[in-house]
Design a protein with these regions (language model features):
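Conserved NTPase motor "head" modules and their coupling/switch loops across ABC/AAA+ ATPases, GTPases
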Residues: 1-31, 174-335, 344-348, 352-355, ...
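Post-Walker A helix-loop "phosphate-sensing" segment adjacent to the P-loop in P-loop NTPases
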Residues: 45-57, 318-327
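Nucleotide-state sensing region of NTPase/ATPase domains
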Residues: 47-147, 210-213, 260, 267-273
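Structural recognition of the conserved hydrophobic beta-strand(s) that form the central parallel beta-sheet
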Residues: 72, 362-368
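A conserved P-loop NTPase coupling/switch region
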Residues: 106-111, 119-191
Length: 394
């Protein structure tokens, strides 16, 4: 898969940008602040409906624009598809496919597949659990786009249940009315939580061998990398937000969704008093974590800076390997985006990463200095200037 045309209107620093792209490697070069990342951010947003830089859509829309438009023409084998995404801060985003009538933005998920590497990826290893939960949730949607609804359903139920717990806490007592209503939301959250947890477990199971291969490819192979799912069904959350548990995480993989739902109901009952006291849900996928293990030790706190970078890159590269294996149809591979990554890496890691990704159908790279880009990724050079492109703009 590749994009051969991209148009941005009112997106970040671009009042209007029209850009032709080719298969192979394209390198966007320009000083920091000129808008290189804005270009690849738009493509990443088209694929995931989220930004790797901000949590809301508002910053994506130019200050003096009421909305932003991202248009792209996707090429997959002999098929060309035009996709348009309309960003409306404070209102629902809309999309168009081949200029047809508007549909929900979610309808375009899965049409454009990307894997994006960025300096922010260090947070996957060094940061709090929220970064890793976001990673696994992005993965489940990349593999099965309908899981975007699975995630949003859980978030909706969680919001309602938390509101009820907060209300009970504010009232100073837990009434029979609270109990009856909470039991209803327990059922909803158990089912929604089981669906989301099952999707995460399946995705992690599929990612695991590719993560291990990716880490070996990026390093000398002296240490093995793996990820362990830590569920609040099997432990408690400490002050740092991490799940502490001595239980065998593999046990969860053998449970069906109805069995997981029963586990959630039991956990809700066991934590009822604590949840009312705190006015929030203490058990569920929203508090789970991925524990990243390097060799025999947790990567967080024990890995060197170089190892931390290698692990972060391996998570993304492993995702690329998985998506390639998920659909072996010619032309179906994801677009690779490397946003200001090479400036952060030593020469050896630069060389290894470049050698691996150079064979992808389309690779989009940003860099402040062209000299940061390894020779293996020599390709079309596009100079970015404030508000535009010097070449090859239309």
């Amino acid at each position: 898969m590749y994009i051969d045309y991209l148009s941005l209107t009112g997106f970040r620093s671009y009042a209007q940008l029209d850009l032709e792209l080719k298969p192979g490697v394209t390198v966007f070069v320009g000083p920091n602040g000129t808008g290189k990342t804005n270009i690849v951010e738009a493509i990443g947003y088209l694929a995931s409906l989220s930004s790797h830089r901000v949590s809301s859509d508002a910053p994506l829309v130019s200050f003096d624009a009421g909305q932003a438009l991202v248009r792209a023409r996707l090429v997959r084998g002999s098929q060309r598809t035009s996709v348009e995404l309309e960003l409306n801060p404070g209102r629902s985003n809309r999309a168009r496919i081949n200029r047809a009538n508007p549909v929900r933005a979610r309808e375009i998920l899965g049409m454009c597949r990307t894997v994006l590497f960025a300096p922010e990826d260090l947070a996957l290893v060094k940061g709090d659990p929220a970064s890793r939960r976001r990673f696994i949730d992005e993965l489940i949607v990349s593999l099965v786009p309908r899981h975007a609804a699975t995630r949003s359903d859980y978030e909706r139920v969680l919001k309602q249940r938390n509101a009820l717990l907060k209300s009970a806490r504010a009232a100073g007592r837990f009434t029979s009315s609270h109990e009856a209503t909470l039991e209803v939301w327990d059922q909803h959250m158990a089912v929604a939580g089981a669906s989301l947890l099952a999707a995460r477990l399946e995705a992690l199971h599929r990612l695991q061998p590719h993560l291990q291969s990716a880490y070996r490819d990026l390093t000398d192979g002296s240490k093995a990398a793996r990820a362990v799912y830590r569920s609040t069904l099997q432990g408690t959350v400490n002050d740092d937000g991490a799940v502490v548990s001595d239980a065998n995480p593999e046990e969860l993989y053998g449970l069906s969704e109805p069995e997981l739902a029963e586990r959630f109901l039991a956990a809700f009952a066991a934590n009822r008093r604590r949840e009312i006291e705190r006015g929030t849900s203490l058990v569920g996928p929203h508090r789970d974590d991925l524990e990243l293990i390097l060799g025999q030790a947790p990567a967080k706190g024990y890995a060197s800076h170089g190892e931390t970078w290698s692990f972060a890159l391996a998570l993304r590269l492993g995702t690329y390997y998985l998506l390639l294996s998920d659909d072996e149809t010619p032309g179906a591979g994801p677009i690779l985006i490397l946003d200001d990554v090479f400036a952060e890496l030593d020469v050896q890691r630069r060389s290894r990463l470049a050698g691996i990704v150079s064979g992808a159908e389309q690779v989009l790279v940003t860099a402040a200095v062209a000299g940061d880009i390894p020779e293996a990724l020599a390709g079309e050079l596009v100079t970015v200037v404030p508000g535009g492109i010097s070449a090859p703009a239309l």
